[in-house]
């Protein structure tokens, strides 16, 4: 059996590229939240100015239209950025799954194992059947080979 989640969390691919992608996603989400707050605050401020009679209805309408354009632009940009991040996450996940699959195939190339299971489905098993460390080592080996091949 293989502890797939452990392999994916501990492999070099995740440590180098996965963590960076996760940080990039979190940074984008914080940026979106901040931008939304700023636009909402701008709209509230405009409403307060209008209610206090500090701005004409004509100016208020012009500023409201300006805010609406900013919101539309923000939403469009955020959507594009989210799609890019989704695609990057999709590619990253596929690469990780491919490395895992290739590692298991290489480890079992001699047909030493008749069945290899994901440990998440196990309730109890003999720990001598755990091939997680071997799979992790092979995943890292394949990742290093892939990185070396990309540089050529």
Functional labels for PLM-detected ranges:
Residues 1-152:
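Amphipathic, charged alpha-helical segments and their helix-to-coil junctions
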């Amino acid at each position: 059996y293989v502890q797939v989640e452990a392999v994916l969390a501990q492999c070099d691919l995740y440590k180098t590229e996965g963590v960076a992608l996760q940080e990039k996603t979190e940074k984008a989400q914080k940026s979106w939240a901040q931008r939304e707050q700023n636009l909402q605050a701008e709209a509230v401020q405009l409403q307060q100015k209008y209610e206090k009679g500090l701005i004409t209805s004509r100016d208020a309408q012009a500023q409201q239209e300006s805010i609406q354009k900013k919101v539309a632009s923000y939403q469009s940009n955020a959507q594009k950025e989210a799609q890019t991040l989704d695609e990057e996450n999709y590619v990253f996940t596929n690469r990780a799954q491919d490395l895992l699959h290739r590692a298991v195939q290489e480890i079992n190339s001699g047909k030493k194992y008749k069945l290899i299971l994901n440990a998440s489905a196990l309730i109890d098993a003999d720990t001598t059947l755990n091939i997680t460390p071997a799979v992790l080592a092979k995943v890292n080996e394949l990742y290093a080979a892939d990185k070396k091949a990309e540089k050529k």
